[in-house]
Amino acid sequence: MSDVKTGSGGSPRRPYNSPKRVQAARERRRRMRTAAERLFMRDGYEPTTMLRIAAEAGVAERTLYLAYPSKAALLAEIIQVGVRGGEGDEPLARRAPWVEMLAATSIAEVVARFAGGGAALMSRAARALWLGEANAASDPQLQQARRRGHANIRADMTEFATGLHNRGALAPGLDVQEATAILFAICANETVFLRLTDECDWTPDQYAGLIDRLITKLVIAPHPSAA
């Protein structure tokens, strides 16, 4: 069925979406996510209701439900925006920092950029990721979002490992599948980041340095080519 409406004179009348209206809707959606994240982190996922989130965001509960049909949808988008580093439909692996990282001249620079990008991602998203993991068992929608998220992460790690393989940089005897598993285990664990930064007073830069060293030790050939 067409979305184009007809005016009184029979001429087609298209939905009106001014830049100001689109921007206002985007800002309202951002305000809802910010309010939800604040309450989730302060009070926990389970005790936080959609009504309280709406009140915190300064919108009607119906408005919140029109944007996000459930708490799980809200948390999933909070995580997605944090992981991607911004709004929009482009996945992480199609955004400029990732593309530029894979195109870096030397393997050492590729690994350093990957580690630094991972630290920045964890700084933005680790707490929301941890919250999703902690509550997935009791929320079927979160379970689904968790499975999708893990699949996306593994796909990104596979792309990274494949890029290293194509440049002759994987350690001897290491194939793309095993390299992907190692990267998935050591680079996509928000608990490790939070333990180091919260309990050991590490900075994100120190975490990036650790990831750099681990990848270099476990995944990269001793003298990789720069091809």
Walk through the language-model features, giving the residues of each.
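Hydrophobic/aromatic-rich alpha-helical bundle segments in the mid-to-C-terminal region
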Residues: 3, 165-214, 222-227
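Ligand-binding pocket scaffold of soluble enzyme catalytic domains
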Residues: 4, 51-52, 63, 67, ...
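Amphipathic, non-transmembrane alpha-helical scaffold segments
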Residues: 25, 29, 79, 111, ...
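Helix-turn-helix
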Residues: 31, 35-77
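Hydrophobic alpha-helical connector segments
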Residues: 71-73, 77, 88-123, 180
